[in-house]
Amino acid sequence: MKIRRIELFNLGPYIDKNIFDINCNRERHIVLIGGKNGAGKTTFFKAIKTCLYGCKVWGFEAPGKEYFRQMASFVNSRMQFDSHIKAYVEVELEFDDGKQINYFVLHREWYRIKKGLEEKFLICKNGCELDRESSIDFSNYLLSIIPPDMFNFYFFDGESIADFFLGSDGSRNFRNAFLKLYGLDTLSLMVENFARALKRSGNSSN
């Protein structure tokens, strides 16, 4: 998987359309994003994660009132005063399976309604919009190849990477990301469940 393009529209300090072409090759495959404090580096990374994973990035299993409250502070402040202004993040991905190269565009958009914000999420494959079922399948596939915890190994900012690795939860973060990447998180959960079952069985026999 390769990220080719990122587009931010009215998110944080980004006003109107901002396009980042980060298409790389084998010789030049690391992209550095620089800027002064407050220029929008953290917003840039947070927007990419939100586009790919949605509310899960913000700690929610499904979009709800609290999620949209946080998103209201994430989008550009102009949306508070003009109901016609929208905000979105769009990410273009390239997948090469060895036989064919496919291009996916993920578009996550927020717009105002009377009670706050509403979200719209679209996925296009090679220029054609996917239906709801195909979009869910692709989102699940994306979660399987790069879980949100693993995202920090590929996209990180200098202010948070030290906390991710060296903070109080650093070891757990690394362990969880590794298990999810290799599909071992289910096995680990099974081992823990068996251990608890054996412990209960031992206690009941006593």
Please identify what each model-predicted range represents.
Residues 61-72, 99-153, 163-177:
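Glycine-rich phosphate-binding loops of NTPases
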Residues 158-206:
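Extended, Lys/Glu-rich alpha-helical coiled-coil stalks
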Residues 31-34, 45-102:
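Conserved P-loop NTP-binding catalytic core
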Residues 2-53, 178:
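Pre-Walker A-like glycine/lysine-rich segment at the N-terminus of P-loop NTPase domains
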Residues 48, 52-56, 146-150, 181-189, ...:
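Conserved NTP-handling cores and scaffolds of large molecular machines
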Residues 2, 84-89, 116-120, 149-152, ...:
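Short glycine-/polar-rich loops that comprise or flank the Walker A/P-loop
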Residues 5-7, 88-92, 105-107:
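Beta-strand secondary-structure signal
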Residues 56-57, 99-103, 116, 186-192:
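Short, solvent-exposed secondary-structure capping/transition elements
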